[in-house]
Regions:
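Solvent-exposed N-terminal domain segments of exported/luminal and surface proteins
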Residues: 2-5
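Extracellular structured ligand-interaction cores
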Residues: 38, 66-68, 107-113, 122, ...
Length: 213
């Protein structure tokens, strides 16, 4: 599996190497995963693209490419994925997005993932009834702050509405993850929760759809 790009900072030689390795990984994706998930994802997005070409963005200096998808394995007892949205990640991983933003309209990106194997219990995707355009600050894992300075306790149903989705094996979800605050609930039971996923957005010239992870 690929190394996380945020660990490289701005070192161009390491970034070039990262992008080259990504392309090699993608060329061997059937061997790596036992199934051509990239073709499945690309075919799905092509049916939704309105005729636009769908592809993975090229790497720095046109060397290699971004990674098309990542697998996430969350083990029971190892917690959850805390509340976040795609737009807030641009502040945490600005080095990553600095290059991607040259070709891709990453703001308000769309998120997708496919459930490969759900946990025995827990692991639901929770979508909260607040958007990045209204709420842009994380106080802690259970508290957000909106643009009016009001605190939102995401554990309190009187403070915010939410929708929980439990996916079955093979289910794919596509949602406005750039704007919608969301989290993955704690994994319980004895089974790992295994998904693949990533993001999709228009190219800067609106002539293509790019997907990456």
């Amino acid at each position: 599996f690929s190394t996380a790009i945020e660990s490289f900072g701005k070192d161009e030689s390491e970034l070039n190497s990262y992008f080259v390795r990504n392309k090699i990984f993608r060329e061997n994706i059937v061997e790596n995963f036992g199934f051509d998930f990239e073709s499945l994802i690309q075919d799905t997005f092509s049916q939704l693209s309105g005729g636009l070409k769908v592809e993975v963005p090229q790497g720095m200096n046109d060397k290699g490419s971004y990674i098309s998808l990542t697998a996430k394995i969350i083990k029971p007892g190892q917690g959850s994925i805390p509340i976040h949205c795609g737009n807030v990640l641009q502040y945490y991983f600005d080095d990553f997005y600095e290059h991607l933003e040259k070709s891709t309209s990453v703001y308000d990106q769309v998120s997708y993932f496919i459930m490969l194997d759900p946990s025995d219990s827990g692991g639901e995707l929770t979508l909260y009834n607040t958007l990045w355009s209204e709420t842009q600050k994380i106080i802690d894992n259970s508290t957000l702050e909106n643009l009016d300075g009001e605190k939102i306790n995401i554990e309190d149903p009187n403070s915010i509405g939410k929708q929980q989705l439990k996916l079955n094996p093979g289910d794919m979800i596509i949602f406005s993850g750039g704007q919608i605050w969301h989290r993955i609930e704690e994994i319980r039971g004895s089974k790992d929760r295994i998904t693949i996923g990533g993001f999709i957005a228009y190219s800067k010239n609106n002539e293509k759809l790019y997907y990456w992870s």
